[in-house]
């Protein structure tokens, strides 16, 4: 008799986690953050690309009752990170807010109320604001890089296939 492939021990909590948490290879996450750090000098010209990258970071529905965690890898030793943990979610939210602010989301409404051409002091303030925005983005990217290198993140939010299944008491039945 053939055994249907899938997890035993899979439950509602894991189903919700699979739907709401994004997972990403640790190597891909590090490369992406390094790429964002490299754009530091021209970050304001790459806002849309960075914002899109942050919003699409990782993959949801990475596993399910019938889809094995990390199954699309050639071996089970590759490390995947959960981007749905509270700390990393807060850091990514701060980065998103910094990018949205620098992009001017909300500024169009404020500027429309002015109605007059900007004066010299207003232009100087806007130039200072751009410097502040660049600094806020750079700080948020640096904070993310520092965090993903911490033992707390790598030990609690990063998994191989075996460590994920052991943590959540999952047993894969059938062939992968």
From Swiss-Prot:
The protein's job, in short, is: Capsid protein self-assembles to form rod-shaped virions about 20 nm in diameter with a central canal enclosing the viral genomic RNA. Isoform N-CP does not seem to be required for virion formation and systemic infection in host plant.
User: What gene, per UniProt, encodes this protein?
Assistant: CP
What are the annotated GO cellular component locations? Answer: helical viral capsid
Q: Which family does it belong to?
A: Belongs to the virgaviridae capsid protein family.
Q: Which UniProt keywords apply?
A: Capsid protein, Helical capsid protein, Virion
- Molecular function GO labels: structural molecule activity
Question: What protein am I looking at?
Answer: Capsid protein
Q: Which organism is it from?
A: Soil-borne wheat mosaic virus (strain United States/Nebraska/1981)
Kindly give the Pfam families that the UniProt entry links to this protein. TMV_coat
